[in-house]
Amino acid sequence: MSVLPFLRIYAPLNAVLAAPGLLAVAALTIPDMSGRSRLALAALLAVIWGAYLLQLAATLLKRRAGVVRDRTPKIAIDVLAVLVPLAAFLLDGSPDWSLYCAVWLLKPLRDSTFFPVLGRVLANEARNLIGVTTLFGVVLFAVALAAYVIERDIQPEKFGSIPQAMWWAVVTLSTTGYGDTIPQSFAGRVLAGAVMMSGIGIFGLWAGILATGFYQEVRRGDFVRNWQLVAAVPLFQKLGPAVLVEIVRALRARTVPAGAVICRIGEPGDRMFFVVEGSVSVATPNPVELGPGAFFGEMALISGEPRSATVSAATTVSLLSLHSADFQMLCSSSPEIAEIFRKTALERRGAAASA
């Protein structure tokens, strides 16, 4: 029996298997654990290691067959998950060999889409992040210097040098404040208050830069996906890039579960829809099913008449909607859009009449 189907079953279980494995690694560090319990935990680690070995074999076979390509990071994680514990078991005779199974921390990240996004965010925001980090370093040294000057005679054992004062500066800038080092003078306490406020501002800058970067990355991905969808719609294929950008910016995402009614016949319509994923069923005398790239509901925007058919989700469907207010703005700024919609409405009305 081929092991190739195993990968499809196993891939979602990376985190599920890693969790008990890492808990077993932690439990094996308890000094007074009985020998039987240690043996059971070691057996559990061996079972998980065997599962990871099968996954590695499946991945390599799929890659050799050409089914999977460009998965070097995933394969590297699979190789490390197998070889590192094996090498530790064979070469390290001490009970600490199980600690090397901590490499399984990488397994839940194997199929994650978060870290590629994080990498792009860090690359895009590198200049701003480096700038804030530089500011942090400057403030850190300045605070340590000030604390050294103010407190060195009062607490020479804690502020007797700038490196010693830097520990207090770090924990105070991060607003952690362990309490092991506290300024005794009035000037030192005023400095501590100012440093805490500065730390909040600096960490707020870091958080704001990363949050903005993630938001822009998600928006960029949505924009590209929506652009590809809109550009593939025959209705818009003759429009220029500038007009397409306006349309994409006006679209709003919506997900509808299977069987749900999207619009009913006779209802007033205030938007049209584009199908991104899934399919919808149009209840006409000759029922029609529309898939990705199709659109419906444009008649209500053009003529203002009620819905001419009931449309429901044949499967779970992702839609992009264009509201009437946005539609009117687009038509006023780009008359060619209004003309394209008008011609399409006439064609569909004629086709419906002939049917």
UniProtKB/Swiss-Prot annotation:
Q: Which compartment or compartments is the protein found in?
A: Cell membrane
Q: Which residues lie on this side of the membrane: Cytoplasmic?
A: 1-12, 62-74, 113-129, 211-355
| Segments carrying motif Selectivity filter | 175-180
State the annotated membrane topology for this chain.
Answer: Multi-pass membrane protein
In alphabetical order, the GO MF annotations are: cAMP binding; identical protein binding; intracellularly cyclic nucleotide-activated monoatomic cation channel activity; potassium channel activity; protein-containing complex binding
- Any stretches that span the bilayer, and where are they? 13-30, 39-61, 75-94, 95-112, 130-150, 186-210
Cite the effect that the entry attributes to residue 215 to A. Answer: Increased channel conductance
May I ask which residue range the UniProt record assigns to the signal sequence?
none
Q: Which cysteines are joined by disulfide bonds?
A: none
Describe, as the record does, how this protein assembles with itself and its partners.
Answer: Homotetramer.
Matching SUPFAM superfamilies: cAMP-binding domain-like, Voltage-gated potassium channels
Would you identify the family this protein belongs to, as annotated? Belongs to the potassium channel family.
Task: Output the PROSITE patterns linked to this UniProt entry.
Answer: CNMP_BINDING_1, CNMP_BINDING_2, CNMP_BINDING_3
Which positions are listed as intramembrane? 162-180
Domain of life (superkingdom): Bacteria
- The name of this protein is Cyclic nucleotide-gated potassium channel mll3241
Q: In UniProt terms, what function does this protein have? A: Cyclic nucleotide-regulated potassium channel activated by cAMP.
Q: Which UniProt keywords apply?
A: cAMP, cAMP-binding, Cell membrane, Ion channel, Ion transport, Ligand-gated ion channel, Membrane, Nucleotide-binding, Potassium, Potassium channel, Potassium transport, Transmembrane, Transmembrane helix, Transport
Q: Which residues lie on this side of the membrane: Periplasmic?
A: 31-38, 151-161, 181-185
Residues noted as binding 3',5'-cyclic AMP in the record, renumbered to the chain: 297-298, 307-308, 348
Q: List the GO cellular component terms.
A: plasma membrane
* Coiled coil, from the record: none
